[in-house]
Amino acid sequence: RHEIGGCLATEESAAPGFRGNTHANIILPWYFAPIYRDFPEFWEYGVQLDQHICGSGAVFNKEQDYIAIYSEKHDPTQERSAKEIARWSEKDAEKWLKLWALWQSDEMQRVQVDMLFNPAEFRIAPEVLNRQMELYPKLVEAGFEPDAMVLAASHMKAARDSWESKALQYCVVRFALSGAYDVNEPGVGATTMGMAASLPTLCFVRGGTHQVAHAAHQILVQNGCKFFTHAEVDKAIIEDGTATGIKLSDGSEVRARKLVVSTLSPQQLCFDLIGREHLDYKLARRVEQLENKFCCLMWYSFALHEAPNYRAASMNPDINDTFWLGLAEDADPWHVAVECHYSRLGQWPPLEHYCPTVWTHSMVDPAYAPPGKHVAQNEQLAPPASAHSEKEWLEIKRRYAEELMGIWQKHAPNMDWGNIIGIDTNSPYDNLRMKNLAPNGSMALLDRTAYQVEGARPTPELANHRTPIKNLYATGAAWHLGANAGSTEAYNCYKIIATDQG
């Protein structure tokens, strides 16, 4: 079946009637802010966000304990979260409330919007930099001064510097990994605070993430757009350095009235759509060297008779209704760092360093599963698709299901094979069905290293969505902000087009 939306995908994959999001799951409140503003019907058309009781948390096998971060919906002041954090550190609980107050402030939100919904050249405007300076005293007051060490730090270092409790460090670092960051990579410490503050805000789309694609399609069709799902593009038509249309693989041509926009990977854009003959050596070389072997994931869906019932629920029943729940051997973020190390080597870590997260959307939205049943999903870092052959991946997918069930059952005794109705095994190798994710199956398209983010994503020459070809623009997950299901990349491209075209 050919569906629009790319990784905004939902399928009845584990068993008939059980919906699973095969790629994007986390939706943050700001993801579609410009769309809700400009097209209020977007919500009614299906992009309706909801939250679990707890936005994030983790259960720890050795300690037989847990940590829970309540969602904004169920804990708007974050007092309940602070109470849970205080079980591990009173100091962290106090600082958590300061962070939440800072995060809710107008000054912080203005800076956030500046950095999210502006292309690279707009983000260096004096008024943008002035708003950052105005925020600085509030950061210091809350205990998050972005000094030289923080700016140079990895997520691992910054989390350990900011929080006393290893349990809270684990939650923050594990979420950074879900943001496609290798938590050992330096130069990102200024964003670790945002990772922590986002934990109560984690949302999902009722009915499945593919609802986003349907809603966007409806708006676009109403505004005169047409879609062609069986028309592979071969090349951009370039005349005198200007894009004047596209040539399809069957030889037919489609002329452009004003411009052409690509959402391909940078490699597809430069070497397939444009052609190497139109690129200078420096840009071609940089695109050739882009890194995309990290954040390749195991994404499984499980059709269940019963929702997981965690041992930690005897201490707090709300842990059963947690969105991004880490299944950890113990409360030490070092496990996440080790898992990243092994992934960089193209290897699997020892089982004690596995750091899966799991969730059960059917506990909040019954549309995900038949009455009385549930669907659960997981995410875990894996080696890139290129690390193994097809035959090896088939065996790995079987083996990983056994390993994950063994870990899960330690924390939730009812998660045995008798509780499983069906299972969908989605791996980095399976991600290759999306051409733009080849050859490694990374969910983020590009690694989020310090030299492939913000004004350097994907390269400085392409970061502002312009290409070497006039009237040919580019966007997608390989552009800022990247590695999410939101609208930042598209909206920022629109701003550049509006600036250029008038």
Spans of model-derived segments:
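A glycine-rich dinucleotide-binding beta-alpha-beta segment and adjacent secondary-structure elements
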Residues: 166-181, 348-359, 413-480
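A conserved FAD-binding loop/helix module that cradles the flavin
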Residues: 24, 475-499
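Active-site/ligand-binding neighborhood in enzyme catalytic cores
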Residues: 104-223, 230, 436-452
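Mid-domain catalytic core of redox enzymes
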Residues: 204-205, 234-369
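Conserved FAD/dinucleotide-binding core of flavoprotein oxidoreductases
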Residues: 267, 271-274, 303, 372-403
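N-terminal glycine-rich phosphate/pyrophosphate-binding loop and immediately adjacent elements
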Residues: 1-117
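Active-site-proximal substrate-binding core of FAD-dependent oxidoreductases
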Residues: 232, 238, 499-502
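Flavin-binding catalytic cores
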Residues: 307-308, 341-351, 392-432
